[in-house]
Amino acid sequence: MITWYGHACFKVDNVLIDPFVPNPLCDLPYDEIMEGVEVIAVTHGHADHLGNAEELAKTYNVPVVTNHEISVYLSERGVCAEGMNIGGTIEINGAKLTMVKAEHSSDISPTISGGVAAGFIINDRVYHAGDTGLFGDMELIGEIYAPQIALLPIGGRYTMGIDEALVAIELIYPEIVIPMHYNTFPLIEVDVNEFVKKAEALGVEVIVPKIGEPLEL
């Protein structure tokens, strides 16, 4: 089951990723978003991804899985946080998460390091790319993990845009692609229908979810 809450925030099975909620695309209540969530995963330290992880983790007594530096930061603030790094795998509360490379920055603030940005393979079938530019080792992610579903940023400016995301699809070659990280703010506004048309021409299924509506995939 996959549910999109705008920007890069998804619920994948029992894992909530990058909990930037509320956001300009989503004003759903916490109780609805956190229903069934047993793990929070954070790809990097920027505010639109670390989001409300601290508040949600404390309120709902849910552990946070993230890179080592962010886990230390959260632990010092009273959060149950599990640190890991790129290439590592953790199994927690019935979820399996493997941290993979991303090309992006990650500072929590100008004075607090957020380690390095990353993506996740969730339960061996979903690839959440995090914030990233295009990089050649996406081909290795496709070869090694063979994700059925890829959640890819398309908004440009701070991540891949549409054209780069299309190349990423050819490197990873998942069965299903779900676009993310677009139209949240004016700087990352794109025509998602353009992406859908071009991606489908590559032979993959593209799904543009409605906010808060679960997809049985």
Curated annotation (Swiss-Prot):
Pfam families: Lactamase_B_2. SMART domains: Lactamase_B. SUPFAM superfamilies: Metallo-hydrolase/oxidoreductase (SSF56281). Disulfide bonds: none annotated. GO terms for molecular function: hydrolase activity. InterPro entries: Metallo-B-lactamas, RibonucZ/Hydroxyglut_hydro, UPF0173, UPF0173_UPF0282_UlaG_hydrolase. Keywords: Hydrolase. PANTHER family: UPF0173 METAL-DEPENDENT HYDROLASE MJ1163 (PTHR43546:SF3), UPF0173 METAL-DEPENDENT HYDROLASE MJ1163-RELATED (PTHR43546). Belongs to the UPF0173 family. This is UPF0173 metal-dependent hydrolase MJ1163.
